[in-house]
C-alpha cells in the first residue's frame, strides 16, 4: 500500500509542502524546481527521491490514454478530507459539455497545474491527496 501525501502550495514562501496524510500535522517544505533542473524522463523513482518529488514531475501513467492510476491522481475537498475521489472521474463530471473525452490530459497539463501554481485554483481542491505508484516519471513540457 502506498503512502498518501497531502501536498499544499505555499505561495508566500514559494514552496510545496508535502505531509503524510492523517498521521502528522506538519512536514518539511520542499522548494519547487527551477526551469533548468529538469530530470531525465526515464528516471524511475527510488525510495530516497520519493520524498522530494518536484511539482513538475508526474508518473508516466498520468498522461496515458487509459488515464492515470487511481492511487496516483486522487483528490479531496478541504471540507471532506477523509473521502478522496478519483481525479479523472471528478474532472470528467466537471467537463460534461466538452466535445471530446480525451481533453482532460491537456487541461491538466496546461491549465490545472498553472492555476495551482498561480494560486487561482478552485478553493475546494486547493489541497491534493496523492498516492504513489512505481511508474517512471516524466517531465511536463
From Swiss-Prot:
Q: Where do the record's region annotations for Disordered lie?
A: 24-51
Provide the primary localization: host cell
Q: Which domain of life is it from?
A: Viruses
Q: What GO terms describe the biological role, i.e. biological process, of this protein? A: DNA-templated transcription; symbiont-mediated activation of host NF-kappaB cascade; symbiont-mediated arrest of host cell cycle during G2/M transition; viral genome replication
Tell me which InterPro entries the record gives.
Transactivation_prot_X
Q: Would the keyword Transcription regulation turn up in this protein's UniProt record?
A: yes
What's in the keyword line of the UniProt record? Activation of host NF-kappa-B by virus, Activator, Apoptosis, Host cytoplasm, Host G2/M cell cycle arrest by virus, Host mitochondrion, Host nucleus, Host-virus interaction, Modulation of host cell cycle by virus, Transcription, Transcription regulation
Q: Name one GO cellular component term.
A: host cell mitochondrion
Q: Name one Pfam family in it.
A: X
Q: Which segments carry the region annotation Mitochondrial targeting sequence?
A: 68-113
| Processing and modification events after translation | A fraction may be phosphorylated in insect cells and HepG2 cells, a human hepatoblastoma cell line. Phosphorylated in vitro by host protein kinase C or mitogen-activated protein kinase. N-acetylated in insect cells.
| Location(s) in or outside the cell | Host cytoplasm; Host nucleus; Host mitochondrion
Low complexity: which segments have biased composition?
24-48
Assembly and interactions?
May form homodimer. May interact with host CEBPA, CFLAR, CREB1, DDB1, E4F1, HBXIP, HSPD1/HSP60, NFKBIA, POLR2E and SMAD4. Interacts with host SMC5-SMC6 complex and induces its degradation. Interacts with host TRPC4AP; leading to prevent ubiquitination of TRPC4AP. Interacts with host PLSCR1; this interaction promotes ubiquitination and degradation of HBx and impairs HBx-mediated cell proliferation.
The family annotation for this protein states: Belongs to the orthohepadnavirus protein X family.
Say what the protein does.
Multifunctional protein that plays a role in silencing host antiviral defenses and promoting viral transcription. Does not seem to be essential for HBV infection. May be directly involved in development of cirrhosis and liver cancer (hepatocellular carcinoma). Most of cytosolic activities involve modulation of cytosolic calcium. The effect on apoptosis is controversial depending on the cell types in which the studies have been conducted. May induce apoptosis by localizing in mitochondria and causing loss of mitochondrial membrane potential.
Q: What is this protein called?
A: Protein X
